[in-house]
Amino acid sequence: MAEKNNSVIPSGKVVYNSSIVRSIIELAIPKVEGVVNNFQPGNSSKNYIKLEFLENFNVAVDVAVTIYYGYNITDVAYNIQQSIKNNVEAMSEYKVGTIDVHVVDVIFDGSEHE
């Protein structure tokens, strides 16, 4: 069952399902130049997202990605971190703490390795 977090605001209560944060991240990562978009339903072999919900609406993120050959890995990882942080914090009440990026594969010549 999905984890839910509640927030009380003056005009009512906002409830976040944990899958919302995952969806935001799934949309944020492929926007980064150099990242192979493998985020499809049921495809968790190369790209994954792990979330740890902490106190006070903080979240720790752990992602694995595949990048295209020719891109600077450090720059791509930094851009992924910024994209995740900016999107999650802009679209939810969560504050992103740590974001660990694991580059698990590099794709050469535009073709994917199996």
Outline where the language-model segments fall.
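N-terminal, polar/charged subdomain of small-to-medium soluble alpha/beta proteins
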Residues: 1-42, 46, 112
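Mobile acidic interaction elements
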Residues: 27, 54, 66-74, 91, ...
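Short edge beta-strands and adjacent turn/loop segments
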Residues: 32-66
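A short coil-to-beta-strand element that immediately follows conserved catalytic motifs
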Residues: 37-40, 96-100
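Envelope-exposed proteins and targeting segments
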Residues: 57-61, 71, 97
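Short, non-transmembrane amphipathic alpha-helical segments
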Residues: 73-92, 96
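Short, highly charged C-terminal tails/helix-capping segments
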Residues: 98-114
